[in-house]
């Protein structure tokens, strides 16, 4: 699937060249494993790295609505399959390579299915444990996301 050209919608903020950018990073959990995706080569930031389902907080929608939309758009899991959403403690992730500070909102999303349909933003996915995730090339800061959600992930 080819990357669509980004055009901000009315009310949407373009953080592409901004110094600070608020983002969600969702860890999708099904039973005793969680989903990580390998980012597409066509993404502006961190192509090829493994990460949760992430997106800019770039409009005025509520957080739960934004989370459900990202999950549906990026991995094809509808809102009806989301069991719980839990928010972790927000943190800043400095990234000199992109001259950006990410304001990361860690989110745990428990789902009732492991059926995934990727969109263009990811080229691969795996359902993994903590130990399996550590062996992959993780997006900078994703280890902190996992740490801040660890008490819920390991249940």
Task: List PLM regions with ranges.
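Helix N-cap/coil-helix junction residues
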Residues: 76-77, 138
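Acidic, metal-coordinating catalytic segment for phosphate/diphosphate chemistry
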Residues: 1-25
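Conserved Nudix-box catalytic region and its N-terminal flanking loop in Nudix hydrolases
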Residues: 33-73
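Conserved hydrophobic "DFG−1" position in protein kinase catalytic cores
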Residues: 28-29, 36, 109, 127
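NUDIX/MutT-family hydrolases
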Residues: 106, 117-148
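Active-site-adjacent beta-strand/loop module that shapes the phosphate/pyrophosphate-binding cleft
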Residues: 30-32, 89-115
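A short coil-to-beta-strand element that immediately follows conserved catalytic motifs
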Residues: 78-88
């Amino acid at each position: 699937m080819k990357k669509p050209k980004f055009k901000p919608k009315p009310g949407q903020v373009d953080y592409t060249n901004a110094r600070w950018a608020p983002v969600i990073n969702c860890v999708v959990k099904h039973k005793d494993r969680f989903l990580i995706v390998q980012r597409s080569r066509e993404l502006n930031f961190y192509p090829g790295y493994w990460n949760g389902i992430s997106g800019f907080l770039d409009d005025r929608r509520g957080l739960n609505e934004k989370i459900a939309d990202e999950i549906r758009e990026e991995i094809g899991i509808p809102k009806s399959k989301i069991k719980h959403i839990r928010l972790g403690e927000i943190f800043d992730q400095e990234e000199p390579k992109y001259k950006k500070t990410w304001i990361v909102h860690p989110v745990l999303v428990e789902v009732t299915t492991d059926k995934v349909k990727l969109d263009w933003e990811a080229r691969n996915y795996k359902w993994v444990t903590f130990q399996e995730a550590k062996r992959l090339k993780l997006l900078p800061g994703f280890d902190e996301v996992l740490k801040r959600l660890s008490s819920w992930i390991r249940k």
